[in-house]
C-alpha cells in the first residue's frame, strides 16, 4: 500500500512540476532571438544566462516595472514582456514578442542574489518603440552588476 501511495505521489508531482517551473522563470531573448537572461518571477530577479544575478524588477504600476541593477542603477522598464532602455528601444524580450527564437542552451547554475543597494532616480519615461536597441541585452543588464 505504501508503494502504491508513493508511486501515485511521484506521478502526480512529475506531471505538475514542469508547469510550476515553467511559470516561475521567464526567458529573455536578445534582438537576434538568443536566450541571454531570465526573470525569476518569485523574487523578480533578473539573471544572465550564466547564472549571475544582475538586476531586479520593482513594480511601478499595474502594467509596468522598473528594472534596477543590484548596484542601484536604473536600467530600464519592463512592460508587456519587453525590457526597454532609456532611449525607448527594446533591449530584450520574451519569445512571444519576437518573430523567431533559437534553441536555448542549458542555463548555468544560479549564483547567490546580491544585497540591493539604494536605487538611483528613475529617468523620465521615454516613448517606447517597436525597434531593438543597438546595445546588447546582456551588456545593458550587466551594467546592474558593476559597483
Give the positions of each predicted feature.
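Long terminal segments
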Residues: 4-6, 11, 18-35, 42, ...
Amino acid at each position: 500500500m505504501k508503494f502504491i501511495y508513493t508511486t501515485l505521489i511521484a506521478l502526480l508531482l512529475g506531471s505538475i512540476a514542469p508547469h510550476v517551473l515553467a511559470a516561475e522563470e521567464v526567458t529573455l531573448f536578445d534582438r537576434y532571438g538568443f536566450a541571454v537572461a531570465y526573470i525569476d518571477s518569485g523574487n523578480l530577479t533578473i539573471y544572465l544566462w550564466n547564472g549571475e544575478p544582475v538586476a531586479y524588477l520593482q513594480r511601478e504600476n499595474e502594467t509596468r516595472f522598473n528594472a534596477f541593477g543590484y548596484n542601484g542603477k536604473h536600467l530600464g522598464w519592463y512592460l508587456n514582456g519587453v525590457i526597454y532602455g532609456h532611449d525607448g528601444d527594446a533591449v530584450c524580450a520574451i519569445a512571444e514578442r519576437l518573430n523567431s527564437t533559437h534553441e536555448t542552451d542549458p542555463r548555468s547554475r544560479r549564483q547567490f542574489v546580491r544585497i540591493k543597494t539604494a536605487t538611483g532616480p528613475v529617468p523620465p519615461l521615454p516613448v517606447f518603440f517597436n525597434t531593438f536597441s543597438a546595445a546588447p541585452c546582456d551588456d545593458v543588464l550587466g551594467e546592474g552588476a558593476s559597483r
